[in-house]
């Protein structure tokens, strides 16, 4: 019994952003952002066990913002798991204001396990 393999290659551009979200007024004004649960579960699997174990207490994480051109910024945020949801706070509001994000801006997020930090990008 032969099995068929699908060897068709696509020409879609590479998209590294595991988590994508369109920012809301609430995300921008409340001092925290709740991250989409299903997408964030993919990121948690890549993180160190000790870090994940302490999410209930809140852990400081580095966030490297990737910009077009030579500019980039680093921020320290608090990542917390509360009532089954993960959220950034403790630095989120300052980052939002410094980068002038607006409602409906799309952001992308991924975990860089080698440098143990988040990579963050303003997609559009």
Swiss-Prot record:
InterPro entries documented for this protein: B3_domain, DNA-bd_pseudobarrel_sf
Keyword DNA-binding: yes
Protein name: Putative B3 domain-containing protein At1g51970
MF terms in GO: DNA binding
Keyword Disulfide bond appears in the UniProt entry: no
Classification via SUPFAM superfamilies: DNA-binding pseudobarrel domain (SSF101936)
Subcellular location: Nucleus
DNA bind region: 18-124
The organism of origin for this protein: Arabidopsis thaliana (Mouse-ear cress)
Keywords for this protein: DNA-binding, Nucleus, Transcription, Transcription regulation
């Amino acid at each position: 019994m032969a099995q068929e393999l699908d060897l068709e290659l696509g020409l879609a551009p590479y998209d590294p952003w595991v988590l994508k979200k369109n920012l809301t007024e609430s995300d921008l004004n409340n001092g925290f952002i709740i991250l989409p649960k299903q997408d964030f579960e993919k990121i948690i699997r890549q993180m160190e066990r000790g870090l994940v174990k302490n999410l209930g207490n809140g852990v400081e994480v580095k966030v490297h913002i990737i910009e077009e051109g030579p500019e980039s910024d680093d921020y320290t945020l608090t990542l917390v798991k509360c009532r089954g949801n993960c959220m950034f706070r403790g630095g989120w509001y300052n980052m939002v204001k410094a980068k002038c994000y607006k409602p409906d801006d799309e952001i992308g997020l991924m975990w860089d396990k080698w440098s143990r930090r988040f990579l963050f990008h303003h997609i559009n």
